[in-house]
Amino acid sequence: MQPKSISLLQKIDSIIETIIVKFTNIFENLQDANKTTEILSMESLAMENNCIQIIRLCQDLISISRNLKEIWVLNSIKVTQEKFEWKQEEIDIMFTQFNLLTDKIAEFETDMNKE
């Protein structure tokens, strides 16, 4: 495996582990019901902080996923070095596929922003 792949997998594992730790912290704070107002306010602040960090970590995972998809798609469309004449029909098909792909990506991003 390439060093880039290993470091990417380590980063993903690290992000997932951190998300699990943050969720665990949130659930641990919810267990004891007999707490003073001061402790509840401190735990509420800590819980809000954990939630914000979880959201940011999930955004990092989404970014990694998107980058991998872009690399996969762009590497699958290789252009040869030869002088090759494209037929207009082939060009139209390629543009149609590319436009469809960008529309789906934009639709996906719009759906993600609504949530």
Curated annotation (Swiss-Prot):
Lineage, opening ranks: Eukaryota, Fungi, Dikarya, Ascomycota, Saccharomycotina
Leader peptide range in chain numbering: none
Q: Which domain of life is it from?
A: Eukaryota
* Pfam families the UniProt entry points to: Med22
An annotated GO cellular component of this protein is: mediator complex
Keyword check for rRNA processing: no
> What is the first-listed, main subcellular location in coarse terms?
nucleus
Q: Which GO terms describe its biological process?
A: regulation of transcription by RNA polymerase II
Q: How does it assemble?
A: Component of the Mediator complex.
Question: What family does the database annotate?
Answer: Belongs to the Mediator complex subunit 22 family.
Q: What is this protein called?
A: Mediator of RNA polymerase II transcription subunit 22
Where is this chain's protein located in or outside the cell? Nucleus
Recorded hits in Gene3D superfamilies, A to Z, give: Mediator of RNA polymerase II transcription subunit 22
Organism, by scientific name, is: Candida albicans (strain SC5314 / ATCC MYA-2876)
Q: What keywords are assigned to this protein?
A: Activator, Nucleus, Transcription, Transcription regulation
Annotated Gene Ontology MF terms? transcription coregulator activity
Described purpose of this protein according to its UniProt entry: Component of the Mediator complex, a coactivator involved in the regulated transcription of nearly all RNA polymerase II-dependent genes. Mediator functions as a bridge to convey information from gene-specific regulatory proteins to the basal RNA polymerase II transcription machinery. Mediator is recruited to promoters by direct interactions with regulatory proteins and serves as a scaffold for the assembly of a functional preinitiation complex with RNA polymerase II and the general transcription factors.
